[in-house]
């Protein structure tokens, strides 16, 4: 039995010697490489926080002390140390979440895993502890250097620093290669001195002495005030030369570091010092993403930030998909458009490769801007670029557009800015769970005046609709597509005057059908399957792809009037979604055909594969067909319009309101 198997609770770490802790760190790395290689997941970040997480759990008493991870993908080691070592079904339906999950453990606090929020959580928890008489309990926020590019983190630091009584320890996990620690003899000498200096600067006696001299000098008239200002400036100059702490301490936070995040003894010393101070402290830990795993370190792109199923020895994928991804199609097309138009600029929020702007950046590096994890800034900056004569293309994951809704509404849409927003990972994404499903976007943008929304069904339509989007310069445009592989090409049998594609209708070409099926984006294949199944039941249908779901095309409303029932199949939430908007337009036009929204419930959907999640919520051809047949037969609401000579179905079985 290895040491890892003996750790059932963080308190078990206290029994281990320094040598045993080093052995445990090695076992954890081996465990992560073996298990994450088999399931996929965030391997590189977790290999980089092994010693850091061990030190945090050795020095703080979880769950009495709250540990918050920003972002939660770096919590695998935390899970292992808190009794969750069954990683065989990590990120799979019924298995462990890839992020902290309160349902799994009392040691988990924050589940959302959208970056830059942990310090606000720490601020709130520590305030609550003070007000409820539990101010002796610590809050530890483990935050990546990338998350500190988000403005929300600095808003929180500003508030945390204002109260010196709160026991907040912010551990900055700095694995950015552009912030690598200085090497060499002189740097090693400074590093050997730094623990002594940090110990002095974080003692209460040192703080009391500074406050006493400050008051004495400031009360000493002009001469004393001049002396204080001079000494304070000299102290600050020496401090800024000695360590990169000025940015934090200017905000009123004590700073310890930089510390080697892979040196357990150094990390424990730093955390002990921070703990003894008793007030807000930042511990700056320098780490290496993918530490201890050569294939990760050799990966220049992202050091195995997130991997699929790989060979643990080589790091090579074990399954090569021949299908093209939505992202790769976008990457090629936006780069080609940029070649043709010098006014096109790309904006990303710290995700150049994942959102497909890398080819654009390779060809035109001066026209691709990485703003960091700052979606709010990205949208307003884009509005400014549009005002200046450019056409920005902001590429983000669909779930992260939520963070910038006010900027979309008030900075982009209100000013009719020609900004194109490309939403990757729209709809159900699968293994990463509720905080990463891109299922809220369509309902959210429905209420933005003047916005145009496209949902391509295949690669050809993505290229086509992206070009149409960047041709609009007097309103915001949004193009959304799914995660993963693009399906087969689905050719239209007709395109109507306003751009709506007819994908299927009765063989004789008649539009007098029972059911109008409106398919949104990647749901077209499912919609065609439903139409085939309905045909086998003797129910005729027309299948349309609006291509541009906003504004609602008039031909959709005209077709709805000539059918007995409309169903809208979408991979966004039903409430306020595309179907809801079509219903409103139908009623405004006096069309009383019943409409059924077939989409996602307003729920936080737990992780699983995309197909498993869709099956759980009833977005399958079998379930949709079953419901539509019942609606046409008049046994399930909404009832299809009766045929001539038929009466409306009885509603005696319905509840009385």
Swiss-Prot record:
Positions contributing to Mg(2+) binding: 145, 175
Pfam families registered for this protein in UniProt: DXP_synthase_N (PF13292), Transket_pyr (PF02779), Transketolase_C (PF02780)
SMART domains from the UniProt entry: Transket_pyr
Cofactor binding note from Swiss-Prot or TrEMBL: Binds 1 Mg(2+) ion per subunit. Binds 1 thiamine pyrophosphate per subunit.
Residues that coordinate or bind thiamine diphosphate: 73, 113-115, 146-147, 175, 293, 375
Key words of the record: Isoprene biosynthesis, Magnesium, Metal-binding, Thiamine biosynthesis, Thiamine pyrophosphate, Transferase
Molecular function (Gene Ontology), one example: thiamine pyrophosphate binding
Single GO cellular component term: cytosol
Functional pathway: Metabolic intermediate biosynthesis; 1-deoxy-D-xylulose 5-phosphate biosynthesis; 1-deoxy-D-xylulose 5-phosphate from D-glyceraldehyde 3-phosphate and pyruvate: step 1/1
GO biological process: 1-deoxy-D-xylulose 5-phosphate biosynthetic process; isopentenyl diphosphate biosynthetic process, methylerythritol 4-phosphate pathway; terpenoid biosynthetic process; thiamine biosynthetic process
Organism superkingdom: Bacteria
Enzyme Commission number(s) from the entry: 2.2.1.7
Cofactor: Mg(2+); thiamine diphosphate
Record-linked PROSITE patterns: TRANSKETOLASE_1, TRANSKETOLASE_2
Catalysed conversion reaction: D-glyceraldehyde 3-phosphate + pyruvate + H(+) = 1-deoxy-D-xylulose 5-phosphate + CO2
SUPFAM superfamilies: Thiamin diphosphate-binding fold (THDP-binding), TK C-terminal domain-like
Residues of the signal peptide: none
Assembly and interaction partners: Homodimer.
Main function: Catalyzes the acyloin condensation reaction between C atoms 2 and 3 of pyruvate and glyceraldehyde 3-phosphate to yield 1-deoxy-D-xylulose-5-phosphate (DXP).
HAMAP family per the UniProt record, alphabetical: DXP_synth
Family the UniProt entry places it in: Belongs to the transketolase family. DXPS subfamily.
Name of this protein: 1-deoxy-D-xylulose-5-phosphate synthase
Annotated source species: Paenarthrobacter aurescens (strain TC1)
Lineage: Bacteria, Bacillati, Actinomycetota, Actinomycetes, Micrococcales
